[in-house]
């Protein structure tokens, strides 16, 4: 069995050469659906949602097909894949397990039995974490703060962003924790009692002590905030982050996402006020309770064994080139 994610170049081709099944595991959707667009697309109209998956898949294929065919011919001893066919992992006959909470993003109705949504997977980092005394004392000295941080992502103007963050917290009367990260946030002209600056820290420990969170919208950070029942504002930079921002807003646990190039004082103030609404907190608590009984690791293992094919004659197990996505079929040319 080959286990992989859709972005790993060559996974289906290696499985074909070895004549063994493949199972895809991933943290964002790669299977076509009419319920939401491909996370790497920016399609806004529902009529284009399903097509967006095929287009993204095809664009990836067009960029790597020469390299893949070189691998197939020289290393895997397989015939090359034709110019307009090929796929990076969205074939409906390949089992997929998606690692997110079905209470946040339910399994789409047009996904078949080979697709599973298993729940988030978490590392327990909090149990072995010893917070600095200064942080513990600061947390004890006032109301729960709002966490703001963007991890390792670069910030174009960290001084300006820090100023916006501080002014938004002061305007809304909130204490704040700023994660300096790799973006250089938190260079204050003078220390402020209402602001605590820190470097990387286990989210599963910190978020339990926070009133709300503002972050970039990575799948792991999003999951940690929701598990801690924190209303969430997502400031997406790229990739699947806009997707998670939309899902958080759709679920009622945060405001509409603020793209990083639209980050401004009025928008951050509005986002903080949105998160302070008691109804939003109630929704966050409701979602966190629903997630309590999820075990993504166990769900992933169960999905793996459920989808493990029964042993068949060798002639039946060899992947067929006809199973690969065809761009010509997508546009009705066949």
Regions found by a protein language model. Give the residues of each.
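Two-component system phosphotransfer/interaction surface
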Residues: 262-277, 297-309
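Nucleotide-sugar-dependent glycosyltransferase catalytic domains
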Residues: 1-145, 150-175, 187-190, 282, ...
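Nucleotide-activated donor-binding/catalytic signature segment of Leloir-type glycosyltransferases, i.e.
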Residues: 173, 183-201
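Short beta->alpha connector loops at strand-helix junctions that form conserved
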Residues: 25-27, 217, 234-238, 256-260
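Short internal beta-strands
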Residues: 176-180
